[in-house]
């Protein structure tokens, strides 16, 4: 929402934990697979009511575990498993969100194509080479990870692969027309 000077009140919960708590565990080994930690704020996860209920139940169970058994050795493993459960649910819910984007928003693909067309129309390849995923994402005001995940969901391939195919097709067309690349 734009800032109109009125005070907003938000509610919810935040899951915070010391990195040492997960060091050497399955969670620490899987952290790189959770791309959503690198998304911009405008690429937030939008939960359905059912998804909110699922996460709230998990968090209630986690709070109960900490309140009643916190400090017990067996509790640490249960808490780690609950953290992993929250992370995996978030991955699932992002996958659903990407499917929704793919169904209802072909606009991102059109805009991606336009970014590539404009890049070559402006002859930026002469200075910068092949456009990068980071460049395309920034032109669309998206983080590279979010952009990559959306394109992967929409096209079944990475943005890098799509860019390579675009460049290859463009080069073939220029070679067939005897023009300079």
What are these regions (language model features)?
Residues 1-38:
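N-terminal regulatory/effector-sensing and dimerization cores
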Residues 56-67, 113-120, 172-176:
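Regular secondary-structure segments
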Residues 36-85, 89, 93:
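Amphipathic alpha-helical segments enriched in hydrophobic/aromatic residues interleaved with Lys/Arg
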